[in-house]
């Protein structure tokens, strides 16, 4: 009562598994990429054009600008690890900000201009 589908002795299944993957599916070794020597790279660059070398020189000169010595902090003026109190009246005045009391006064002065609508 067995059929060809349920019978383990069927020859059809054996032949279908033998060629499950075609040879063009990446089973072969990868092609080796031969790196160029430095001499070959230089020759190719020269063949492409010599104007690239002039542009490279300009870029190098721009990166070598002089450093302004006035922006360098003298020793002992580092700010790393220093606690700064930004809430003091002196700090707020120096920054041009108003203190809490002045802000509260400004708020109360503007209140008389506002008219509430019911």
Swiss-Prot record:
It comes from Laccaria bicolor (strain S238N-H82 / ATCC MYA-4686). InterPro entries: Histone_chaperone_domain_CHZ. It holds the Pfam family CHZ. It comes from the Eukaryota. Residues 1-17 have a biased composition (Polar residues). Forms a chaperone-bound H2A.Z-H2B complex that acts as a source for SWR1 complex-dependent H2A to H2A.Z histone replacement in chromatin. Forms a heterotrimer with H2A.Z-H2B, stabilizing the association of the histone dimer. Also, with a lower affinity, forms a heterotrimer with H2A-H2B. It is found in: Nucleus. One of its GO terms (cellular component) is nucleus. Residues 36-68, 102-112 have a biased composition (Acidic residues). Residues 82-92 have a biased composition (Basic and acidic residues). Keywords: Chaperone, Nucleus. Its main location: nucleus. Coiled coil: none annotated. Belongs to the CHZ1 family. Residues 1-118 are annotated as: Disordered. This is Histone H2A.Z-specific chaperone CHZ1.
């Amino acid at each position: 009562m067995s059929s060809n589908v349920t019978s383990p002795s069927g020859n059809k299944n054996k032949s279908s598994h033998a060629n499950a993957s075609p040879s063009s599916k990446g089973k072969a070794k990868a092609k080796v990429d031969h790196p160029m020597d430095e001499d070959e790279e230089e020759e190719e660059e020269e063949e492409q054009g010599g104007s690239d070398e002039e542009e490279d020189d300009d870029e190098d000169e721009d990166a070598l600008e002089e450093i302004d010595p006035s922006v360098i902090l003298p020793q002992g003026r580092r700010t790393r690890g220093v606690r700064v109190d930004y809430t003091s009246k002196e700090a707020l005045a120096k920054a041009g900000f108003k203190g809490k009391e002045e802000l509260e006064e400004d708020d109360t002065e503007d209140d008389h201009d506002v008219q509430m609508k019911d």
